[in-house]
Amino acid sequence: MDIRKVKPCIKSSAFTRADWQTMRKYQAASERSGFILLPGKEVHARSPLFFLNANTLIIMQDIYIDIETYSSVDIKTSGAYKYIESPDFEILIISYAINDGPVITIDLAQGEPMADEFEEALFDPDFRKHAHNAVFERLSFRRIGYDIPVEQWYCTSVKAAYCGLPLSLDEVSKRLDLTNKKLDTGKALIKYFSCPCKPTKINGGRTRNYPWDAPEKWEMYKEYNVYDVLAEREIDQLLKQYVIPDFERQLYILDQHINDRGILVDMELANAAIEVDTIYTDVLMEKSRAINGLENPNSPVQLCKWLSRKTGDEITSLAKDQIPLLISKYSKDKDVVEVLETRQKLSRSSVKKYYAMINCAMRDNRVRGTFQFYGANRTGRWAGRLLQLQNLSKNHLENIELPRELIRAKDWQACEMMYDDVADILSQLVRTALIAPKGMTFCVADFSAIEAREVSWLANEEWRMDVFRGDGKIYEAAGARMFNVPISAVTKGSDLRAKAKNAELALGYQGSLGAMKRMGGDKMGMSDTEMMDIVRKWRKANPRIVELWQEVEDCAHEAVRYQRRVVGTPRNLIFDCNGEYFTVTLPSGRSLFYRNPRFVERVKNKQRVKLLCYDGIVQETKQWGDIDTYGGKLTENIVQAIARDLIGYSMLKLEEAGY
């Protein structure tokens, strides 16, 4: 039977919950194998056709969409939500393709009506809506009255990230070597038609370019839009065999709801903080200028020259870690000390996050779109956008409400009298500018030492798990084992605890001397010899973790070398390789993807060794390139990914509970 000719027996709106669960199961099976097993028969199933049972068939279809828009709001600084909220926002061009059909373009900017076929597909729940960075299309259509549930949207950007590829359509096009690559004419055309322009005599004083101002460019813009649809469809087809698990799908939907809700900002505090910072910066500059007479007392070049003249020594750096050393060295010279302390305060004075809040806050004073789903390749952790909420300054003050009210009242003098460093207070108050609506409580929750717990569980390091089952004081317990002393000797503030903490933070993923230094071991006064001794002691105290690194590396090498499935001893992780990808499947069912795995020869410790290598975004350069990996690094990816899955699972449970 050619099932492509079979019509659906029922519409999806009539499905029960059990029907949907059955369909999802068959959908996953069909996309993995191309076949569905039914009672007593085997039926070939090409997406988008899925059987619910032997007598019922639903045809799920795909529509691929890309749009070009206009708004006077800067999307880079204010985000997509505020960009789309702008009163002058409009959709200029829509291009779409249904299944394998031709790409159709609707020129809304020049008065073309919305196509009936497009509207029907958009509102039909049996159509999966695909777009690259689908949140933008979803919000744009909602803005013009086409409110399509997030559950019906599928993002090729997320799919690419899941498969170890970059997020941007342009970069994915290059890495997959698409037949229909994204055109490189887009940036100039977007700037011309989708952004405001400066009024000039040449353009007749207009503040915006319309299609009739440059008809040839407009045709190029429409062509550019068409190629985006072709590119995203090709991406979807090339990656179709790699199925995103249902758990990930649920998380994506939750992520979209969280970003849609946004977070409320205390605009009065944010505006007051910026005003106070402006005044306080001027006060500090005048204070420093009165001593050194410099035109710009905050200029490192000018200040270094003045300090060199004043001290008789050559001062070449005012880096953050150098200023305390200089203050200590020249402590008897009051002018030098005061100038350096003022410089410290000026360097701490940063109100960028307050500006970001104001730039991104919408009419209801909420900031939306602050989290990027699957922003980190492989681990799948969220990335911060706009406000960088994962990177906010901590507040250490016990009574945070007092300085908060002083800043809201713009009383910086009282704040300085009570706390001395107003810049530091402004930094600590950033978190408090994010507030709950009236009648609600803003709760912040996180796991405690989750990576240390994860690596202990993964390696089955029993003594560490006993610590976490008890008081959780891993630094004290590790110090006692490493230095062979009673745990009572490893107390908070002690040298032994500090060294154990440094080791715990640095060495869990096969780190050595370099890792100890990155975590500040040398700044604690430890020599290279002492740090290497701590490395040996930590590894001796954690033999199962050391074995875990080797087990993970061995499984990875076996999977890639022989291109076969390997079930690893660490908690039955599944290592697999099909030539195109090396994957590690986690307990959640999610896989970590490493593209184009291969072995390369490198010189390490003056010896030529073979290392596992893959293609990815190099962390240091943020560019696509070769990445070497090894047991400890793979362990880090696995641990962080499992930790992310646990957070994701908890988020789903909290959402279900009504938080």
Task: Please give the residue ranges for each predicted region.
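Short active-site loop/helix that positions an aromatic residue
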Residues: V135-Y146, C163, K305-S308, S448-E462
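Active-site palm subdomain of RNA-directed nucleic acid polymerases
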Residues: L239-L251, L646-Y659
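Conserved catalytic palm subdomain of right-hand nucleotidyl-transferase polymerases, strongest
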Residues: Y64-I65, H132, Q152-C155, L434-I450
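Generic long, charged, amphipathic alpha-helical segments
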Residues: A478-K492, K610-R644, G648-G658
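Conserved "right-hand" nucleotidyltransferase catalytic core of DNA-directed polymerases
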Residues: I59-I75, I93-S95, K181, A188-L426, ...
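Active-site-proximal helix-loop-helix substrate-binding element of RNase H-like nuclease domains
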Residues: S86-K240, E398, G472, A478-F483, ...
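A short acidic-Thr-Gly-centered motif at the start of a beta-strand
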Residues: N55-M60, E120-F123, I425-T441, L652-E656
